[in-house]
Every structure is written in structure tokens, then in C-alpha cells.
């Protein structure tokens, strides 16, 4: 088991203070520190220190010894560490995104390769043939949007802005999935005078409407005053996660992170179709083809964890990763899995022991446990988060 040396991604939407306040990570240049990455992603792999004191990339170390480090089932199925674990610190809204399902990712990736679209081209949608399921676990109060509201809810919220666009009136007449799809595309397609008029109607409604989701629209409009994505809180569930609550983000479901600090776990993929709140390229036909226009009640969005002793397991409907929390005590408990694991100290102090080796993790620190090192004993105070595979 090795302590991970992790990198910070300095995206513009990141908080300049959260990682310092929570975990003491220095920020002398006062840059936005958006994400702390833990894993073996080719873009920015964590590093480990070998027995002879050399620092190497975790990705390279796994590549040399896949079966021992990943476990046979994961090595055969995925051929690499199949997840990326992050601390995400949003000071301002991220773009609304949709992740294609596995089959569409494979088809889209092959199609764009055949068309010769460069990987770094603005119009490139598919960077790899994988899907991108995600779990987000709140460390602070965390504001997000996820999945379409129930149609009756959308109807009542759209009434004050019915005059903003003909597609809104069209949906209000017959609120069904087909017309929601047309409305979604129409709002994203708005240009020039049509867009200015629609946003003026929305902003006028803000003066008379109180509470949610109008307050969320006000927050977003500070950063994206001229973006048609400002209509999205009327269509999507606005979710406020309390610390300790989590939700899973399914493929083909629009979602956005708006504000707060969370742990995020995802499959190793960069496939993103944008759907607003962004200056970047939006491929509207491809987006609409990859969205399920079906309602999901807000009450069904939270993941219900299963408690077993000191472990809290968050059920995940895919094999790419599993996520659990462990309450630590002075008495050692065994933590084991048939795969690699990344253990992250959420709070307190964790002591990990394997035979004669002992590793201490302070808040914000993490360790990599190879499959061949499982199980390890854990003790201390506070909580550990564990990401692994149940294969």
C-alpha cells in the first residue's frame, strides 16, 4: 500500500479556498483549485513512491503488474484501473452535461475516428468508447441539477414564461416526452433576437417569482447572463445535497454541478455532450439523440446507503466502481476487496496496517491498495471513503 501523490486541476470554475480550508492544500498562486484527482487517468495520473524511493506514475506501475494490482477479474474486464476518484470544488456552475450510454459511446467514437475528427477538435464529442457513470457525495452543502422534473411540475413552472418561446406554449398544450424533446432543442437553438426576447421574458419573471428554482436561475445568471441554459432549472430537478448525501448520475440524463464541495467517482471516460451553461461547442442533434426525455421524481434521486457495522455502502448500478464509507475506531477493522482500492481520509486520522507496514492518512490524503495487498487493517478516528470494484 502506498500513499498517493495527487494532482490538482485548475479549471476556471474551481474554488480558490475550499481545498485549503478542508485539507490544508496550499494555494500560493491563488488559482482556482477545481478538482483533486486520485487514480491512473492518462491525462493526470496519481504518483506513488516505490520501495527504493523512486516516484513513478500509478498508471505505469499498474501497467507493469496488472493482475496483482487490479485483481484478475478487473484486469480481464477493463485492463486498467476503471475509475477516477475526485474531490470536486465548484465555486460557480459547471456546464449542463449528458453522458452517452456505453453502446452509443462505442458507435460515436468509431464514427468520429472514421471521419478523421482530431481528438482535440472543438467539435469532437467522443474521446473514448466508454460510458461515464458518476456518483457524487456531498462534503459541504452541494447544489446541483439532475434529471427532468415530473411533467406536471414543468408545466406549472413554465406558466410564468409561456410567452418566451413558441416551443414552451407547444409543450404546455400537450406535455409529453416528444414535445419536451422539441422544447429542449428549441431553447438550445435560439439565436439573436429570438434568444434575447426569450431571456428578457425569463428575467422579467424572476422579478415576481420567489423560492426555487427561481433562486437557482438568479445564481446561474450571475455567471451566464446570456445563456439559454438559464431555462434549465425549470425543466430539471434542482437538488440540494446535505453533507453525507449522495446521488448517482445515469447515462442519457442531463445534470450540472452548481456549487459546493463533493467527492465524485466516475468511470474512466471523457465523453461529454454539453447542454448549456458553456461557451463551448454544443452538438444539438447528437445531444438530443442521447437524452432520455423521461421524468424522474426528485425524491428518487438520492442513493440510499446500506449500513453494515461501521461500513456504509452506496449501491452503484454499474461494475466500473463501488463506493463505501468507513467509520474508524481505535480497534482495528479489516477492509478488503478482490480489486484495487483507493482509500481517502475524509476527516480525522486513519491508520492503515498491512503486516509490518503502517501508513497514516490525514484529511485529504489517500492511499492505493493493490488487490494482492488486500485486506488491510484500519483504525483511528473519523471516516475513510473507499473506491474499489465488486467484481
Curated annotation (Swiss-Prot):
A GO biological-process term: carbohydrate metabolic process
Chief localisation class: cytoplasm
GO cellular component: cytosol
Cofactor names: Zn(2+)
Enzyme nomenclature, EC number: 5.3.1.8
Broad enzyme group: isomerase
Cofactor binding, per record: Binds 1 zinc ion per subunit.
Pfam families in the cross-refs: MPI_cupin_dom, PMI_typeI_cat, PMI_typeI_hel
Annotated compartments: Cytoplasm
Catalytic activity: D-mannose 6-phosphate = D-fructose 6-phosphate
PANTHER family membership: MANNOSE-6-PHOSPHATE ISOMERASE
Function according to Swiss-Prot or TrEMBL: Involved in the conversion of glucose to GDP-L-fucose, which can be converted to L-fucose, a capsular polysaccharide.
Family (UniProt): Belongs to the mannose-6-phosphate isomerase type 1 family.
Name of protein: Mannose-6-phosphate isomerase
